[in-house]
Protein backbone atom coordinates (compact mmCIF):
# COMPACT_ATOMS: atom_id res chain seq x y z
CA UNK A 1 0.00 0.00 0.00
CA UNK A 2 2.67 2.61 0.89
CA UNK A 3 4.66 1.63 -2.22
CA UNK A 4 1.79 2.01 -4.69
CA UNK A 5 0.66 5.24 -3.03
CA UNK A 6 4.12 6.79 -2.71
CA UNK A 7 5.99 5.77 -5.84
CA UNK A 8 3.09 5.25 -8.23
CA UNK A 9 0.40 7.75 -7.17
CA UNK A 10 2.65 10.50 -5.76
CA UNK A 11 5.04 10.39 -8.72
CA UNK A 12 2.51 9.60 -11.46
CA UNK A 13 3.63 11.25 -14.71
CA UNK A 14 0.14 11.08 -16.21
CA UNK A 15 -3.47 10.23 -15.42
CA UNK A 16 -3.30 6.66 -16.75
CA UNK A 17 -0.44 5.80 -14.40
CA UNK A 18 -2.38 7.33 -11.50
CA UNK A 19 -5.44 5.18 -12.27
CA UNK A 20 -3.32 2.00 -12.43
CA UNK A 21 -1.66 2.92 -9.13
CA UNK A 22 -5.04 3.45 -7.47
CA UNK A 23 -6.21 0.04 -8.74
CA UNK A 24 -3.14 -1.61 -7.19
CA UNK A 25 -3.80 0.27 -3.95
CA UNK A 26 -7.38 -1.03 -4.02
CA UNK A 27 -6.08 -4.61 -4.21
CA UNK A 28 -4.07 -4.03 -1.03
CA UNK A 29 -7.16 -2.52 0.61
CA UNK A 30 -9.25 -5.62 -0.04
CA UNK A 31 -6.57 -8.03 1.18
CA UNK A 32 -6.03 -6.00 4.35
CA UNK A 33 -9.66 -6.08 5.46
CA UNK A 34 -10.22 -9.72 4.58
CA UNK A 35 -7.20 -10.86 6.60
CA UNK A 36 -7.81 -8.22 9.26
CA UNK A 37 -11.27 -9.62 9.96
CA UNK A 38 -9.95 -13.10 10.67
CA UNK A 39 -7.08 -11.74 12.78
CA UNK A 40 -9.49 -9.58 14.81
CA UNK A 41 -11.75 -12.53 15.59
CA UNK A 42 -8.79 -14.73 16.54
CA UNK A 43 -7.66 -12.23 19.20
CA UNK A 44 -10.88 -12.32 21.24
CA UNK A 45 -13.33 -14.92 22.60
CA UNK A 46 -15.94 -16.07 20.08
CA UNK A 47 -18.71 -14.19 21.87
CA UNK A 48 -16.88 -10.90 21.20
CA UNK A 49 -16.02 -11.57 17.55
CA UNK A 50 -18.47 -9.03 16.12
CA UNK A 51 -17.25 -6.29 18.46
CA UNK A 52 -13.66 -7.01 17.42
CA UNK A 53 -14.59 -6.64 13.75
CA UNK A 54 -16.55 -3.48 14.59
CA UNK A 55 -13.48 -1.93 16.20
CA UNK A 56 -11.36 -2.80 13.17
CA UNK A 57 -13.88 -1.33 10.74
CA UNK A 58 -14.32 1.59 13.13
CA UNK A 59 -10.85 2.61 12.06
CA UNK A 60 -12.10 2.75 8.47
CA UNK A 61 -15.07 4.94 9.37
CA UNK A 62 -12.90 7.32 11.41
CA UNK A 63 -10.48 7.48 8.47
CA UNK A 64 -13.33 8.31 6.10
CA UNK A 65 -14.66 11.02 8.40
CA UNK A 66 -11.27 12.66 8.97
CA UNK A 67 -9.40 11.69 5.81
CA UNK A 68 -11.62 13.39 3.25
CA UNK A 69 -11.45 16.89 4.78
CA UNK A 70 -7.74 16.48 5.63
CA UNK A 71 -6.96 15.27 2.12
CA UNK A 72 -8.88 18.17 0.65
CA UNK A 73 -7.01 20.62 2.89
CA UNK A 74 -3.60 19.22 1.91
CA UNK A 75 -4.53 19.19 -1.77
CA UNK A 76 -5.74 22.79 -1.72
CA UNK A 77 -2.72 24.16 0.15
CA UNK A 78 0.17 21.97 -1.02
CA UNK A 79 -1.00 20.10 -4.13
CA UNK A 80 -2.61 16.77 -4.94
CA UNK A 81 0.69 14.89 -5.03
CA UNK A 82 1.38 15.82 -1.43
CA UNK A 83 -1.96 14.28 -0.44
CA UNK A 84 -0.74 10.90 -1.70
CA UNK A 85 2.61 11.46 0.01
CA UNK A 86 0.81 12.00 3.33
CA UNK A 87 -1.28 8.86 2.80
CA UNK A 88 1.83 6.80 2.06
CA UNK A 89 3.46 8.02 5.27
CA UNK A 90 0.37 6.96 7.21
CA UNK A 91 0.66 3.58 5.50
CA UNK A 92 4.24 3.23 6.72
CA UNK A 93 3.11 4.06 10.27
CA UNK A 94 0.38 1.41 10.02
CA UNK A 95 2.91 -1.12 8.73
CA UNK A 96 5.28 -0.49 11.64
CA UNK A 97 2.39 -0.61 14.12
CA UNK A 98 1.25 -3.95 12.70
CA UNK A 99 4.75 -5.39 13.02
CA UNK A 100 5.03 -4.22 16.62
CA UNK A 101 1.50 -4.69 17.96
CA UNK A 102 -0.08 -7.66 16.18
CA UNK A 103 0.91 -10.82 18.09
CA UNK A 104 3.12 -13.20 16.18
CA UNK A 105 1.61 -16.16 18.04
CA UNK A 106 -1.65 -16.08 16.06
CA UNK A 107 -2.10 -19.56 14.55
CA UNK A 108 -1.78 -19.40 10.80
CA UNK A 109 -4.19 -20.99 8.35
CA UNK A 110 -3.09 -23.40 5.66
CA UNK A 111 -3.13 -22.02 2.13
CA UNK A 112 -6.44 -22.67 0.43
CA UNK A 113 -6.25 -25.10 -2.46
CA UNK A 114 -7.82 -24.27 -5.81
CA UNK A 115 -10.73 -26.61 -5.09
CA UNK A 116 -11.34 -24.89 -1.73
CA UNK A 117 -11.36 -21.49 -3.41
CA UNK A 118 -13.80 -22.72 -6.04
CA UNK A 119 -16.04 -24.05 -3.26
CA UNK A 120 -16.07 -20.60 -1.64
CA UNK A 121 -17.21 -19.13 -4.95
CA UNK A 122 -19.91 -21.74 -5.53
CA UNK A 123 -21.28 -22.77 -2.13
CA UNK A 124 -24.93 -21.62 -2.01
CA UNK A 125 -24.87 -20.65 1.67
CA UNK A 126 -21.88 -18.35 1.17
CA UNK A 127 -23.29 -16.94 -2.07
CA UNK A 128 -26.47 -16.11 -0.17
CA UNK A 129 -24.51 -14.05 2.36
CA UNK A 130 -22.60 -12.27 -0.41
CA UNK A 131 -25.93 -11.38 -2.02
CA UNK A 132 -27.21 -10.01 1.30
CA UNK A 133 -24.09 -7.88 1.67
CA UNK A 134 -24.22 -6.53 -1.88
CA UNK A 135 -27.94 -5.77 -1.79
CA UNK A 136 -27.84 -4.29 1.71
CA UNK A 137 -25.17 -1.82 0.70
CA UNK A 138 -26.54 -1.36 -2.79
CA UNK A 139 -29.79 -0.11 -1.33
CA UNK A 140 -28.14 2.29 1.08
CA UNK A 141 -25.83 3.73 -1.57
CA UNK A 142 -28.66 4.15 -4.06
CA UNK A 143 -29.70 7.06 -1.85
CA UNK A 144 -26.40 7.93 -0.13
CA UNK A 145 -24.53 8.52 -3.41
CA UNK A 146 -26.79 11.52 -3.99
CA UNK A 147 -27.13 12.60 -0.37
CA UNK A 148 -25.24 15.88 -0.86
CA UNK A 149 -27.38 17.16 -3.76
CA UNK A 150 -30.54 15.99 -1.99
CA UNK A 151 -29.68 17.91 1.16
CA UNK A 152 -28.81 20.96 -0.92
CA UNK A 153 -31.49 20.94 -3.62
CA UNK A 154 -34.39 19.35 -1.74
CA UNK A 155 -33.79 20.18 1.93
CA UNK A 156 -32.40 23.64 1.18
CA UNK A 157 -29.06 23.49 3.01
CA UNK A 158 -26.10 25.56 1.82
CA UNK A 159 -23.01 23.79 0.39
CA UNK A 160 -21.09 24.64 3.56
CA UNK A 161 -23.83 23.20 5.76
CA UNK A 162 -23.91 20.02 3.66
CA UNK A 163 -20.22 19.45 4.42
CA UNK A 164 -20.99 19.57 8.14
CA UNK A 165 -23.98 17.27 7.65
CA UNK A 166 -21.77 14.72 5.91
CA UNK A 167 -19.31 14.97 8.80
CA UNK A 168 -22.16 14.37 11.24
CA UNK A 169 -23.29 11.42 9.15
CA UNK A 170 -19.78 9.99 9.35
CA UNK A 171 -19.78 10.32 13.13
CA UNK A 172 -23.14 8.53 13.25
CA UNK A 173 -21.66 5.77 11.09
CA UNK A 174 -18.72 5.33 13.49
CA UNK A 175 -21.10 5.11 16.46
CA UNK A 176 -23.34 2.66 14.61
CA UNK A 177 -20.41 0.47 13.71
CA UNK A 178 -19.50 -0.13 17.36
CA UNK A 179 -23.15 -0.49 18.37
CA UNK A 180 -23.78 -2.98 15.57
CA UNK A 181 -20.90 -5.14 16.80
CA UNK A 182 -22.26 -5.22 20.33
CA UNK A 183 -25.74 -6.00 19.01
CA UNK A 184 -24.45 -8.96 16.99
CA UNK A 185 -22.44 -10.25 19.96
CA UNK A 186 -25.45 -10.07 22.27
CA UNK A 187 -28.23 -11.39 20.02
CA UNK A 188 -26.40 -13.21 17.23
CA UNK A 189 -25.57 -12.13 13.69
CA UNK A 190 -28.88 -12.98 12.01
CA UNK A 191 -31.25 -11.31 14.54
CA UNK A 192 -29.01 -8.21 14.59
CA UNK A 193 -28.92 -8.02 10.80
CA UNK A 194 -32.68 -8.47 10.49
CA UNK A 195 -33.26 -5.61 12.93
CA UNK A 196 -30.76 -3.31 11.21
CA UNK A 197 -32.06 -4.03 7.69
CA UNK A 198 -35.66 -3.51 8.84
CA UNK A 199 -34.68 -0.18 10.40
CA UNK A 200 -32.90 0.87 7.19
CA UNK A 201 -35.97 0.06 5.10
CA UNK A 202 -38.11 2.17 7.44
CA UNK A 203 -35.62 5.06 7.54
CA UNK A 204 -35.21 5.16 3.76
CA UNK A 205 -38.99 5.26 3.36
CA UNK A 206 -39.19 8.03 5.96
CA UNK A 207 -36.45 9.92 4.11
CA UNK A 208 -38.58 9.68 0.97
CA UNK A 209 -41.07 12.01 2.70
CA UNK A 210 -38.71 14.13 4.83
CA UNK A 211 -36.08 14.91 2.17
CA UNK A 212 -37.78 18.20 1.33
CA UNK A 213 -38.25 19.21 5.00
CA UNK A 214 -35.01 20.73 6.23
CA UNK A 215 -34.77 19.74 9.89
CA UNK A 216 -36.70 16.49 9.49
CA UNK A 217 -34.31 15.51 6.70
CA UNK A 218 -31.32 16.29 8.92
CA UNK A 219 -32.61 14.12 11.78
CA UNK A 220 -33.45 11.27 9.39
CA UNK A 221 -29.97 11.33 7.83
CA UNK A 222 -28.17 11.35 11.18
CA UNK A 223 -30.26 8.45 12.52
CA UNK A 224 -29.82 6.57 9.24
CA UNK A 225 -26.05 6.90 9.63
CA UNK A 226 -26.18 4.84 12.84
CA UNK A 227 -27.78 1.93 10.98
CA UNK A 228 -26.03 2.31 7.60
CA UNK A 229 -22.78 0.61 8.65
CA UNK A 230 -24.10 -1.08 11.78
CA UNK A 231 -24.48 -4.29 9.80
CA UNK A 232 -20.76 -4.54 8.89
CA UNK A 233 -19.69 -6.53 11.99
CA UNK A 234 -22.66 -8.90 11.80
CA UNK A 235 -22.19 -9.59 8.09
CA UNK A 236 -18.47 -10.18 8.41
CA UNK A 237 -18.65 -12.42 11.48
CA UNK A 238 -21.55 -14.34 9.89
CA UNK A 239 -19.63 -15.10 6.71
CA UNK A 240 -16.62 -16.20 8.79
CA UNK A 241 -18.86 -18.51 10.84
CA UNK A 242 -20.38 -20.08 7.73
CA UNK A 243 -16.97 -20.39 6.06
CA UNK A 244 -15.57 -22.17 9.12
CA UNK A 245 -18.44 -24.64 8.79
CA UNK A 246 -18.59 -25.17 5.02
CA UNK A 247 -15.12 -24.20 3.73
CA UNK A 248 -12.79 -24.37 6.76
CA UNK A 249 -9.65 -24.30 4.60
CA UNK A 250 -10.63 -21.07 2.85
CA UNK A 251 -11.98 -18.81 5.59
CA UNK A 252 -9.73 -15.91 4.58
CA UNK A 253 -10.89 -16.23 0.98
CA UNK A 254 -14.54 -16.17 2.06
CA UNK A 255 -13.89 -13.12 4.23
CA UNK A 256 -12.20 -11.38 1.31
CA UNK A 257 -15.09 -12.14 -1.02
CA UNK A 258 -17.50 -10.57 1.45
CA UNK A 259 -15.38 -7.41 1.36
CA UNK A 260 -15.67 -7.60 -2.44
CA UNK A 261 -19.44 -7.90 -2.04
CA UNK A 262 -19.43 -4.67 0.02
CA UNK A 263 -17.69 -2.87 -2.83
CA UNK A 264 -19.93 -4.45 -5.46
CA UNK A 265 -22.91 -3.21 -3.47
CA UNK A 266 -21.51 0.31 -3.34
CA UNK A 267 -20.89 0.28 -7.09
CA UNK A 268 -24.30 -1.28 -7.75
CA UNK A 269 -26.07 1.32 -5.63
CA UNK A 270 -24.22 4.17 -7.31
CA UNK A 271 -25.17 2.90 -10.77
CA UNK A 272 -28.81 2.29 -9.83
CA UNK A 273 -29.00 5.68 -8.14
CA UNK A 274 -27.56 7.36 -11.22
CA UNK A 275 -30.10 5.66 -13.47
CA UNK A 276 -32.93 6.66 -11.13
CA UNK A 277 -31.80 10.29 -11.07
CA UNK A 278 -31.43 10.34 -14.86
CA UNK A 279 -34.74 8.71 -15.75
CA UNK A 280 -37.07 9.29 -12.78
CA UNK A 281 -35.60 12.04 -10.63
CA UNK A 282 -33.51 12.72 -7.54
CA UNK A 283 -36.50 12.49 -5.22
CA UNK A 284 -37.13 8.81 -6.02
CA UNK A 285 -33.80 7.36 -4.84
CA UNK A 286 -34.77 6.70 -1.17
CA UNK A 287 -37.76 4.42 -1.78
CA UNK A 288 -35.95 2.48 -4.50
CA UNK A 289 -33.04 2.02 -2.10
CA UNK A 290 -35.54 0.80 0.51
CA UNK A 291 -36.85 -1.87 -1.88
CA UNK A 292 -33.32 -3.15 -2.47
CA UNK A 293 -32.58 -3.29 1.27
CA UNK A 294 -35.91 -5.09 1.77
CA UNK A 295 -34.64 -7.87 -0.51
CA UNK A 296 -31.52 -8.12 1.67
CA UNK A 297 -33.78 -8.35 4.75
CA UNK A 298 -35.76 -11.22 3.20
CA UNK A 299 -32.58 -13.05 2.18
CA UNK A 300 -30.98 -12.81 5.64
CA UNK A 301 -34.24 -14.15 7.08
CA UNK A 302 -34.02 -17.07 4.65
CA UNK A 303 -30.40 -17.70 5.65
CA UNK A 304 -31.40 -17.72 9.31
CA UNK A 305 -34.12 -20.29 8.64
CA UNK A 306 -31.62 -22.47 6.78
CA UNK A 307 -29.42 -22.38 9.89
CA UNK A 308 -32.13 -23.89 12.09
CA UNK A 309 -31.96 -27.51 10.84
CA UNK A 310 -28.21 -27.39 11.38
CA UNK A 311 -28.76 -26.24 14.96
CA UNK A 312 -31.28 -29.03 15.56
CA UNK A 313 -28.90 -31.62 14.10
CA UNK A 314 -26.07 -30.37 16.27
CA UNK A 315 -28.30 -30.52 19.32
Residue positions per predicted region:
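Cytoplasmic helix-loop-helix junction between adjacent transmembrane helices
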Residues: 15, 21-59
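Helix-to-loop junctions at the C-terminal end of transmembrane segments
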Residues: 177-188, 277
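C-terminal membrane-cytosol helix-exit motif in multi-pass small-molecule transporters
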Residues: 88-107, 300-303
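Helix-breaking motifs and short loop linkers at transmembrane-helix boundaries and internal kinks
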Residues: 10-17, 156, 188, 210-211
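Short, small-residue-biased leader/transition segments that mark boundaries at the very start
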Residues: 1-6
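A late C-terminal transmembrane helix in Major Facilitator Superfamily
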Residues: 245-280
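Paired small-residue
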Residues: 13-25, 215-223
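Intracellular juxtamembrane helix-capping segments at the cytosolic ends
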Residues: 32-44, 230-246
Amino acid sequence: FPYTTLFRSWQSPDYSTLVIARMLTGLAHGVFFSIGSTIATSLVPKEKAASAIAIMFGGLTVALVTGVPLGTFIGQHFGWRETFLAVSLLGVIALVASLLLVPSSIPGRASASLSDQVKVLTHPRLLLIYAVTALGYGGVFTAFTFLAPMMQELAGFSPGAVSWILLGYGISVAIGNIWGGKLADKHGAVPALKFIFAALVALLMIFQFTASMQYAALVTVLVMGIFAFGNVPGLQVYVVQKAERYTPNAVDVASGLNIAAFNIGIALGSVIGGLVVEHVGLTQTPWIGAVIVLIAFLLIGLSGRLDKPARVALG
